[in-house]
Amino acid sequence: FNGKSYRMKEHIDRLYRSLKYVRIDPGLSNEEMLEISEEVIRHNEHLRPSGGDFNIRQFVTCGPGRSTKEAGPPTVGVTVAPIDFSRYAAFYDDGVHAVIARTRSYSSDALDPKVKHHSRNNFAMADLEAAREAEDG
């Protein structure tokens, strides 16, 4: 999107719905998070290649503590990193071998699918499974 954020307000609104669900108050309004995110983008604009884009990530944790009950204050962060589109170029030219992994996402009985979270262990497990499958042919 040539340096312009795409639907960031909707992304932040979803994040805040998830925070409400898990009972974490980030100490910032949705609008403040949006302003901070846009400022981080502006501050790092010199890192974005011409015609490139950023991966933008906002995160909120319950903060330091041995348990969620003892934690606080919350830790809030916003990161941006240039997206390396060149790593995908060969996929367009040559195609890519795909594997449907047996590893699944979290059960909706364990975690409400509406919750925006950064637990990606199931993705890592699926990547390992796909790599083994590719090695085995």
Indicate residue ranges for each PLM-predicted region.
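Conserved alpha/beta cores of soluble small-molecule-handling proteins
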Residues: 1-136
